[in-house]
């Protein structure tokens, strides 16, 4: 167990997928972040080994940039937080090794952070939310959750691929590029009609893999690409709205916070604002600069965890490629309600 006063500076390391990013938090305030993103060759998805090689090259450059840009005194750093999972194994390991080496050099503890929890916490921090229903949507997550009994409890989730990944896969196959969500939405603007899509919702859970397959079949049948794009995103977003609406009705929450990279979607915002109005819930979206993977969210969540005594010796660092959101203790949850 590490003992301390209030931590002064926390450095956060994010490396779960295509982005390597370092973030900085001081006294619970986000100071900023730096990052680089691996962009796969056209027509290909993320290759874990190539992403890891990208991260390994980017790490020392970004560390120097962080120190210089924010005038960090390394003597003030109290802990190093890192994204321990879930994510791509090779990419996670690069971040963990870098964080461990930095912690050893500085003589400070490590704070392992759950990537999904970090998305939620940066959204709560940035929107000033206390006890919201959370919709976490990104390339790796599609979860509707709320806090109960010390953890985020899942009220609905994808049964296969995440919404961002599903749309990215479609975009890649039809040549729209990466990242796929904004590219597909841009293409959809040229369409004035929709075609019917299946809406696979099982109870409170969703299935997105079939939407990608169905959309590709429509393209092969000669349906105009903008029409398929518009139909795909409308269906995918209304599926989210359906399970979110049910969760709001069940939990009676009066705040809905939307986190993750797909939260940038303007069309999705229109749909979810309407859901909020119908249920008397205020809908808040994470700011765009914190929507995608970033080191600031790791540093911030690491700060909260460290204040609650959550830390490990550098030699005890670990990564978990699979790690459910609802298995993580969140003892700091109500600290944000007393700011």
Curated annotation (Swiss-Prot):
State the Gene Ontology terms under molecular function: iron ion binding; N(6)-L-threonylcarbamoyladenine synthase activity
| Catalytic reaction annotation | L-threonylcarbamoyladenylate + adenosine(37) in tRNA = N(6)-L-threonylcarbamoyladenosine(37) in tRNA + AMP + H(+)
Record has Transferase as a keyword: yes
Question: What role does this protein play?
Answer: Required for the formation of a threonylcarbamoyl group on adenosine at position 37 (t(6)A37) in tRNAs that read codons beginning with adenine. Is probably involved in the transfer of the threonylcarbamoyl moiety of threonylcarbamoyl-AMP (TC-AMP) to the N6 group of A37.
Question: What EC number(s) does its UniProt record assign?
Answer: 2.3.1.234
Q: Can you tell me which family this protein belongs to?
A: Belongs to the KAE1 / TsaD family.
One annotated GO biological process = tRNA threonylcarbamoyladenosine modification
**InterPro entries listed in its UniProt record:** ATPase_NBD (IPR043129), Gcp-like_dom (IPR000905), KAE1/TsaD (IPR017861), Kae1_archaea_euk (IPR034680), Peptidase_M22_CS (IPR017860)
Q: Which PROSITE patterns match?
A: GLYCOPROTEASE (PS01016)
Protein's recorded name: tRNA N6-adenosine threonylcarbamoyltransferase
Name its cellular compartments: Cytoplasm
């Amino acid at each position: 167990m590490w003992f301390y006063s209030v931590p002064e500076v926390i450095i956060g390391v994010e490396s779960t997928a295509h982005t390597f990013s370092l973030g900085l938090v001081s006294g619970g305030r986000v100071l900023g972040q730096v990052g680089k993103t691996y962009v796969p060759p056209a027509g290909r998805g993320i290759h874990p080994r190539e992403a890891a090689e990208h991260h390994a090259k980017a790490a020392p450059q970004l560390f120097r940039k962080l120190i210089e840009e924010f005038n960090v005194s390394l003597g003030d750093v109290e802990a190093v937080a890192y994204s321990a999972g879930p994510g791509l194994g090779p990419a996670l390991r690069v971040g963990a090794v870098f964080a461990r080496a930095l912690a050893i050099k500085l003589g400070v503890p490590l704070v392992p952070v759950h990537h999904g929890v970090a998305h939620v916490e940066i959204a709560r921090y940035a929107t000033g939310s206390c006890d919201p229903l959370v919709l976490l949507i990104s390339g790796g997550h599609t979860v509707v959750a709320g806090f109960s009994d010390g953890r985020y409890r899942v009220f609905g989730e994808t049964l296969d691929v995440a919404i961002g990944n599903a749309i990215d896969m479609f975009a890649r196959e039809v040549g729209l590029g990466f990242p796929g969500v904004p590219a597909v939405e841009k293409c959809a603007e040229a369409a004035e009609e929709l075609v019917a899509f299946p809406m696979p919702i099982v109870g409170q859970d969703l299935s997105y893999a079939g939407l990608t397959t169905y959309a590709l079949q429509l393209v092969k049948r000669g349906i105009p690409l903008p029409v398929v794009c518009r139909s795909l995103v409308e269906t995918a977003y209304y599926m989210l709205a359906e399970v979110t609406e049910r969760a709001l009705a069940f939990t009676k929450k009066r705040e809905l916070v939307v986190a993750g990279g797909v939260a940038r979607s303007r069309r999705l915002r229109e749909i979810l604002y309407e859901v909020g109005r119908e249920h008397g819930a205020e809908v808040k979206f994470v700011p765009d600069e914190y929507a995608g993977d970033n080191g600031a969210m790791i540093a911030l969540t690491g700060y909260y965890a460290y204040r609650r005594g959550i830390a490990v010796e550098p030699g005890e660092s670990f990564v978990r490629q699979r790690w459910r959101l609802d298995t993580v203790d969140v003892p700091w949850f109500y600290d944000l309600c007393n700011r």
